[in-house]
Amino acid sequence: MRVLVFPSVLHSGQIHSIDINKDNSKILTSGLDKEINVWNLQEFVQLTTEGKDTVKDDIENVKPLLRITAHEDLVNIVKWCPQNENVFVSGDIQGKVYMHDISKNTHELIFPFGWKEDGTSRVVDLAWSDDGRMLAWSSGDCKIHIYDTEKATYQELTSLSNLEKLTVQRSIAFDPTNHYLISMGDDTSIYLYQYQYEPTTRNYQFRLINRISKLINKTSMNVDYKRISWSPDGEYVSVPTASKNQTSLISLLSRSNGWNNILSLVGHNLDCEVVQYNPMIYNSSENNDNPKLFNVIATAGSDMTLVVWNTTKDKPIFILQEISKKPIVDLCWDKTGNSLFVASLDGHLSIVSFHPQELGNTVSEELWKELFEAGEASIKPFNEKPDQDITPSTKKSSHNVIDILDQKNSINVHEAKAKKPTEGIKDLSSISPEEENADTESPLKQDLQAHDKQVTNFVPEVIPAIIEDAPETQTEDILHSAMSTTRSTKSQVKNPKEKPTKVTPEKAKVTTKNGKKRIQPMLISSMNENSSNNSVKKSNTSESNGTSNLVSSGKVLMEFDKPSYSISDDLYKQNKRTKTQDENSNKKLKRELEPVKFIGSVVLNPSTTFARIRLSIPKIRLNFQLSSTVEDNSFILDVKNGLGNETKPSRITYFKKEKQIWCDFIPRFIQLVAEGSTFWAVSTADGQILTYSHTSGKKLLPPIILGSPLSFLESHGNFLMAVTSIGELYVWNIEQKKIHLQSPSSLSSLLDLSNKYQEDGLSKSDNITMCSITNNGIPLITLSNGAGYLFNKDLGTWQTISESWWAFGSHYWDSLGNDDGSKPQSYGLFCDSNDSSIVGLLEQKTNESILRKTRAGRGKYFNKISKNMLMKEGFENLENTISLSHLENRILCCELLGEFKDFHDFFIIYVKRICELGFKAKLFEVCDQLLGPSEPNSTATKDGEANWNSEICGIKKHDLLKEVILSCAKNRDCQRILIHFGKKIGVIDIDEFN
């Protein structure tokens, strides 16, 4: 097998249809450029058999034999005549159908007729009968058109379906035996027609024999092309995009098996729309006495995948994925069955070539004839009644007559072209289904209708229904009696000589029976109608129970159901009329006791019922495993969920190299698992947390009840963090068995930050992108807007670590980027390396969110904004101010997180920067805080000593002050401040300095 993609882009980048002629010499292509190209087929076949060196030279020499430009728009279908190698037809999206003869160089417009230029819909699919006589195509106006090439007649086949609402037929195909025509529509139904030629007049006759709707549950509505294909012997027809439940299938329907599905090919999603049978029948056995026959099918579609199947195998022969860059819309085998041509919307033509007998051994001519004879014997006679009722109940014929479309009722195209539209030829698009059905009725049906007209010869006037005496047991409900008169009943056959009573719309009918007068009810709407609009049609009546049928008068009477009397008790009591009392009455009203309907009602938790936020919870997995990060990787915790009850509980097992260490069973679903330094934590679907020890699986705490399912369960060291679906945050110290912190405002304070009231309502809220905890028990949250936060236990609030504002103007942004791409994003949280940085991790998350929102890139985006801002008055020091603010926030966050190394680096950078900018007040304040109390005898010093700590982030403040003085000594503007603090701390000797 070899695959060749023709490098040239054909038809302006879109090929919509291909076909190969009878003698296997030419191939047609059509597409977007309104042209039809005729190619030499053997030139393409030779390209797949030659070597690489010669192929490059020969590809440049492949040119079309003819370029036909008869159409004025996109040509979406071309088909060769099965009996003439020089004749083909083509259709476009304007609805025009041309017949071409390349030997005579003629191009005839066969539809629409010569005088009809507008009002036609696009041609969807087109097919030739095997004898080359009939041409059928489906159009966008939900019609199927039949054209006889011998007698030049035109007719519509749509009337046989008897549907109230027609749908577009995406695919249409004749069978190879000249007996059947099949179509597939957007309504997931498959219509099968049978046809024959009358022996005397040679007129065709069509009838609908089957309507299959159980194969396809749903169909892709955005697909323009679908291709049904018949097997070479006509025994099978393949249906693409068939589906069973949620599985996409390619169904094979058998003619001899009553058009039932006998085989399904599973290999595509809902993207397989094109199916094409190989024209040869293959035999897997070399012995013709006991043949094992099979067919080869090629399937493709909008998933850009080509699959070739053997119908006797469950798995395909091969799968070619991404053979094109855009959907595949047509497939075509050559007559030898050794080459497959693929057309796609990327403008490339692909050729798949097979070696002889690579797909199998072809059957002999004798066996081929036997198959055709056996197939002819299984075809049912044309006049036989279908096995199933294919006519909808609303359209059933009362005489059980088979609807037949006869050619004698068709339109002669030559006569229609000669006449003008005003001479009685109707516009085809304006023909209603009723008129079409009237024109195409069979002779037998017309005779029966004529017989009915003679029997039921009534004057077209309204005969009112006679109201009989109601039985004594019948209810006197006026609504019930009025409703009963609107029900449709059968009419009774009257004596034709009896004169019916005339009724005018303005007067009600009064009848007398048994001495009593009866007035027939009238609709209020009928009183206001004009008498000119009350034209009454003639109705056929039949024997009934003595009541007459209501005659339609241009409007359909609406039927109503009686109103329901099932009213709630509360509404009934509120609508009861109370007894009126005088204003001066001193009588005390009796208090009605409220009935007790429920005892011991459950009191709902307001925080759960009326939560400010709702977070998504993970789906319950059938089973999952986690490797231990604290111990060796050979330790694995395995979770297998049961049914969530006592009958089949969930199982938790801890293994070491497939050896069980401990096990536990829980009658609930397990959602999340987290590992600490000495414990495992497991959360259930109902909001419980179970804790186990690493070593033996001993319970460390009774189950922790949170009341709502968990969205996040994280741990680090001895700390365990849980975030519920309503945003509640908890952190526990499992070693001390105490709560470490709890957020009273939950996560709603973070998620509500981006909610802004606008004129058209609230804006979309941000979502959580990371939820973690540090080894000090500090929760970290990042949002989709790029902001990162930590929870300060002492303040009881969230504080900002990183946001996109500092990425906008800070010089020090990305100064802590992780250059090692092999490390995970959360590497800085769960490792003890000195290179890790929590602040750097959160700033990296901010970068990712910015890049997702701006396609141009962060640098280009912010550089443009910064230049525009710096040009404005008062914003000259914008970048310096943002940079210092960013450094100050970094220093404070590192102090809270305990990041010693980052704190030292940021602090030195900060003091150097304020010295360069000449901010003496900030430098003095920083040095004064590092110096601390210096006068031991003062009262202020004694009060400050209680709150002053000699260390900050593990560094002595005096040592840090000395480093600051030495680092900034080169700045001349700040030397007076540095000398002042240098004398106090002893860096500068006072005597030597003086």
Swiss-Prot record:
Gene3D superfamilies: YVTN repeat-like/Quinoprotein amine dehydrogenase
Keyword Nucleus: yes
Spans of repeat WD: 10-49, 70-110, 118-157, 164-203, 220-263, 276-319, 323-364
Xref: PROSITE patterns: WD_REPEATS_1, WD_REPEATS_2, WD_REPEATS_REGION
Superkingdom as given in the UniProt entry: Eukaryota
Biased composition (Low complexity): 525-545
Protein known as: Protein HIR2
Gene, per the UniProt record: HIR2
